Amino acid sequence: MNPVEKLALLRVEMKKRHLDAYVVVTDDFHTSEYVGAHFKAREFLSGFTGSAGTLVVLPDAAALWTDGRYFLQASQQLEGSGIELMRMGQPGVPEIPAFLRDHVPENGWIGFDSRTISNDFARSIGEKTREKHIRFAGDEDLVDLVWTDRPALSCEPLWELDVQYAGLTRREKLAMVRGKMKEMGASVFVIPSLDEVAWLLNLRGNDVLFTPVFLSYLLLEQDKATLCVQREAVSAEIEAHLKSDGVTLAPYDDIYRLVAALPTGTRVLLDGERANYRILQSVPESAEVLDRTSPIQLMKAVKTPAEQENERLAHIKDGVAVTRFIYWLKHTIGKEPITELSASKKLESLRAEGEHYLEQSFDPILAYGAHGAIVHYEPTEETDIPMEPRGLCLADTGAQYLEGTTDITRTIALGPLTDEEKRIYTLVLRGHIQLGAAKFLHGCMGENLDMLARTPLWEAGLDFNHGTGHGVGFVLGVHEGPERVHWDVKRQKRHCVIEEGMIFSNEPGIYLAGKFGVRIENLVVVREAEVNEYGRFLALEPLTLVPYDRDAIDLSLLSSRDVELLNAYHAKVFAAISPYLSGDELEWLKEATEPVQFC
């Protein structure tokens, strides 16, 4: 079936239930960014494969909202579907709640699967549509009636992350969170987020591709903890370890029953941005809801000393693999056929040679030429193209190791470049280098740092329509909060001070539709720089250790400070990576990291 046929079947089910709109989000039951195959309902209906987007289906129309990363991709994938693309944040584009208010009649009904809609999103729709007395119908997953060959829920075995990697035991983490619960006056904490449950219990799984988490909820009280999980995924050994730490098991779907059974007067802590709407609706009226940002978010974001040191080890392994890949690509292109997909598979094979390699951390982006202008392009059998010994290849990839999670982008010159390609590459590199060299007082947020990366681009009348940086988990999601580097304060729902020990990305870019794209990305860890009479200064230490492409740099556009920072980074790369290379690869690394001279 194509999207037109699928939407027609969905509308039949909507009509049976007198629904005036049906909302399909990207999320699973845990508001996760990346989801398992079972939860890709929006992709199934629309054909749009991006990681962010919401579909609204009306009786006679449909619209899909996505952000700037996916404008070009979505416009291509939605062609012929009858679905209108709503470019979020652009002039004249309504937000979803306002759209629903304007298109659903008085006393009408909006349907959705309330397990996949966050409480905050449902609340925002309710507030906007209240004046028209519009009601919700959230008990049914109508997509399930249309998607006849839908994949089953994943149920992969859990595994334990040793304390040598995590740095804190399960008991220590539980005590920390219970301490925060006391401070916040909560007697029960409902934890629906997969990454938070995994972090708190030092457990990992394989229920979501690229993200080592498992389908679960945790109900935490001061004297006990209940893990709602698919029992067959938990070995007897892990169950015994959990029991010794005061954690008992319950069936995965029991979370709603357990919440509904909470006694009168219970003060229930939950994060409305991360808890689904059905959980909130299950809370008894006699209980009090404390809708607060989850305290685990900040705990998880500030990496332990052990996590930081392990991440350094992971990035050395990753740096070796990516450096070898760049050497291979530059020396093989034009001599034998290479496509985007074959290059992607080559890089994965090099990473897999590293000790403790687990999997990729997201779908690899290997984008040649004009494909590089599609911010989150992912090569498929249908879109794969051969690469030639000219132009640019944008490679945004990452990996999961026992020692940590990586995410790196390098834009690689495959041969001769145009003056425009070199100019754009160099401007992006300048912004990347300048953010990487930031020294700032504690108390700054990502909004304060963002302009360092964008200034060289703004001065040239250029910009990019995505964040400059996102937090990264430890053997968890490649994207995590609460830290974020972005200039647009209006889009920031929650502001976060940058703390020592946080790890986030530094990834400015420029994308010229139909031509090429450039993005350069390192992960950095926040460290203390100095403390003096003015306060506590922080700085950014690069974790990613892979050379930039000197073949793509226009040295005349670099300042003397840029040159100094470039040479210092390359010296660090050579010192860390060279012991693991030999022969021609080592000789190439020497050339790639040789100091450049200021013009």
Identify the function of each model-found stretch.
Residues M1-C599:
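Active-site neighborhoods and metal-handling regions in enzymes and metal-associated proteins
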